[in-house]
A protein has these predicted regions:
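Helix-loop-helix "hairpin" substructures at the membrane interface of multi-pass membrane proteins
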Residues: 80, 140-225
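Membrane-interfacial amphipathic/re-entrant helices at transmembrane-helix boundaries
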Residues: 1-27, 55, 63-68, 140-141, ...
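Transmembrane alpha-helical segments in multi-pass inner-membrane proteins
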Residues: 202, 206-278
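Alpha-helical transmembrane segments within multi-pass membrane transporters and channels
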Residues: 64-104, 109, 149-153, 255-256, ...
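Short loop segments and helix-boundary regions at transmembrane helix junctions
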Residues: 36-41, 82-125, 214-218, 230-251
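Cytosolic-side transmembrane-helix boundaries in multi-pass membrane proteins
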Residues: 175-182, 186-189, 248-251, 263-327
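Membrane-embedded helix boundary and interhelical linker motif in transport proteins
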Residues: 35-90, 136-140, 242, 269
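Transmembrane helix-bundle core of multi-pass membrane transporters
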Residues: 95, 99, 103-163, 193, ...
Length: 327
């Protein structure tokens, strides 16, 4: 009976979970660009997410228009991606380490931007685009509606951009860097640009979340990469067989973030210890990442293995290794 009573409170919490899922979904789209398109493990996300929130709040507190504040936050995120990209391409630092270095530096930068660990902003005094206060209202300024529109614009712009020559060059760089260089594509430039675009989206998500919750915190991006990966993996697991278009794949990532937050809300409603949420998230991501490997190693059909063995045998007959005498 206690479980049923708790579940009865779930519908009232779903609008907030959906709104948060949509906001984090924009960040997850940024993670998708580096993780799937560029094939780069970018850990800048944990820092650039907080940078977007910090810059947006401080711009609003200084009297700036909300749209201008969002633009400045996006540019700040773009700059963080540029730094990571240059550390990787110009200085030769491995991508994962370059992201860690930028993330570490951004902690101090975010503290400097805000002047302290957190800054709050009142929806009654400032014209915010979205707010937690409006999440249950049936109006145009409802955060769910506003973020759906923002997500649609983001997906539309990315779909157009990755259809251009420059966007196709970024996709080719992630797919096969050696072949891209052979075709005259500047892979270093594409990596830097891809990281910049990705972190610009992450910062946009951070800016929207800071408005939604009414404050920016220096640690608000901690664990963001795990949430982003969870959204990407859940979206692919649920929709990969039916969503083949690039725009639909991006939409599936956003839906994956919504599913993630609904599950989190369900778990919290059932009385799960909130202190263990990060452990749960990490475990879910680890399992979903391991599933493709387990499928190939333990659950592949014998017919497929026989075909692979036959192909290897055929190749060895067609291209025999030179004997020791021939050498």
């Amino acid at each position: 009976m206690e479980i049923i009573a708790r579940l009865a409170n779930l519908p009232g919490a779903l609008p907030g979970a959906c709104a948060q899922g949509l906001i984090w979904g924009i960040m997850a789209i940024g993670v998708y660009l580096t993780y799937r398109i560029l094939d780069v493990a970018d850990l800048t996300v944990d820092g650039s997410f907080g940078t977007g929130g910090a810059v947006c709040v401080m711009c609003l507190l200084s009297g700036m228009n909300v749209w201008a504040a969002l633009l400045v936050a996006v540019l700040a995120g773009l700059a963080t991606g540029l730094v990571t990209g240059l550390l990787h391409t110009f200085m030769g630092i491995p991508a994962i380490l370059a992201g860690i270095l930028t993330q570490l530096a951004l902690y101090s930068i975010n503290l400097k931007i805000m002047g302290k660990a957190n800054q709050s902003i009142n929806v009654d005094k400032y014209g915010l685009l979205i707010s937690l206060r409006w999440v249950k209202e049936f109006a145009l300024h409802n955060p769910i509606i506003m973020v759906i529109l923002a997500t649609a614009v983001v997906i539309g712009v990315l779909y157009w951009f990755f259809g251009t020559e420059l966007g196709c060059g970024i996709r080719a760089t992630g797919s096969n860097p050696a072949m891209s260089r052979a075709q005259g594509i500047n892979t270093n430039f594409n990596i830097v640009l891809g990281l910049a675009v990705s972190n610009a989206l992450v910062a946009l998500s951070g800016a929207l979340l800071s408005q939604y919750q009414g404050f920016a915190d220096v640690g608000m991006g901690r664990g963001a990469i795990v949430i982003g990966l969870a959204a990407v993996i859940i979206g692919e697991a649920v929709f990969s067989r039916i969503f083949h278009n690039f725009a639909l794949k991006l939409a599936s990532v956003s839906i994956g973030a919504i599913i993630y937050y609904i599950v989190i809300q369900l778990v919290l409603t059932l009385g799960f210890d909130a202190n263990l949420l990060k452990l749960l998230s990490a475990s879910v991501v680890a399992v979903f990442l391991a599933v493709p490997y387990w499928k190939g190693k333990y659950f592949s059909k014998p017919v497929k293995k026989a075909k692979e063995d036959a192909k290897k045998c055929l190749r060895s007959k067609m291209f025999p290794k030179p004997s020791m005498q021939a050498r």
